[in-house]
Regions:
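Short glycine-aspartate micro-motif
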Residues: 78-82, 165-169, 187-189
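Buried hydrophobic positions in well-ordered alpha/beta secondary-structure cores of metabolic enzymes
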Residues: 33, 50, 68, 81-84, ...
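Acidic-enriched catalytic cores of C-N bond-cleaving enzymes acting on peptides and small amides
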Residues: 180, 202-234
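Acidic/histidine-rich catalytic neighborhood of metal-dependent amide-processing enzymes
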Residues: 40, 103-104, 108-183, 230-232
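A short glycine-threonine-serine/GTX helix/turn-capping micro-motif
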Residues: 13, 177-178, 197-204
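Acidic/His- and Gly-rich active-site-bordering loop/insert found
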Residues: 2-105
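Predominant activation on well-ordered alpha-helical scaffold segments within soluble catalytic domains
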Residues: 23, 27, 44-47, 116-124, ...
């Protein structure tokens, strides 16, 4: 029923015409360095584009997420659409985009500048075609998704300070795949302290912190975990 609405059909048609513009935007964002914990420059540009495309209520929250609210009629659930802004590549990486035919090469252009491109294009299609929703939509660029970032941006989004009924994460380039569900994640920092000593003179009678952590890692590697729900550890 939604797909049959004239304004939605018009949005689909416009999205097809909008490909070149969306690609230019993807390239622009990719060429703004955004390693985990240092997404601020890309975040400022994402916030600027959200405002350009019609959002009045756009903030960069204390942790660095960009959150833009598109009000609905007030009678429905609040849906957040998010794409992480950080890249797995370290600071100083050459992020200049190189084109070969129809293929674009650059660190982070897929993961996750493609997600940011889609997020902003969806916003444009809603605004340009005057699509109204019952509930509010939150357009979110999150920080700290990769590695030691520990998904901190998404976790902060759900810290209870905002009412959110649903969340759609847009990540990478596999547009033909939809995953439904939520994966729990826990991270621990384990510190092993020892008395110290000389590796030769004190061998055998002073405990080695390195040996202790290696033994702990070996035991963890032998853990049996459930297959359903799928459970992993590193």
């Amino acid at each position: 029923k939604l797909a049959a609405k004239p304004e939605v059909r018009a949005a689909f048609t416009e999205a097809e015409r909008d490909v070149d513009r969306a690609m230019r935007e993807q390239i622009e964002l990719c060429e703004i360095e955004a390693p985990t914990f240092h997404e601020e420059n890309r975040a400022r540009r994402v916030a600027e584009l959200m405002r350009t495309y019609g959002l009045k209520d756009v903030v960069i929250d204390p942790i660095g997420n960009v959150v833009g609210r598109r009000p609905g009629r007030g009678n429905g659930p609040v849906l957040a659409l998010g794409a992480h802004m950080d890249s797995v590549f370290p600071a100083g990486t050459d992020v200049k985009v190189r084109q070969e035919g129809r293929i674009y090469h650059a660190p982070g252009i897929g993961d996750n500048c493609s997600g940011l491109r889609a997020l902003l294009q969806i916003l444009r299609m809603y605004e340009d075609n005057h699509i109204e929703t019952e509930g509010d939509l939150l357009f979110v660029g999150t920080v700290g998704e990769e590695g030691n970032g520990d998904i901190r941006g998404s976790k902060a989004l759900f810290d209870g300070s905002r009412h959110i009924d649903g969340f759609i994460a847009i990540d990478s380039t596999d547009v033909g795949r939809i995953l439904k569900g939520a994966t729990g994640s826990h991270r621990w920092r384990i510190c092993v302290d020892g008395t110290g000593g000389h590796s030769y003179a004190d061998f055998g009678h002073v405990p080695s912190a390195i040996h202790a952590i290696c033994r702990a890692g070996a035991k963890i590697a032998d853990f049996k975990v459930p297959e359903d729900p799928k459970t992993t550890f590193t």
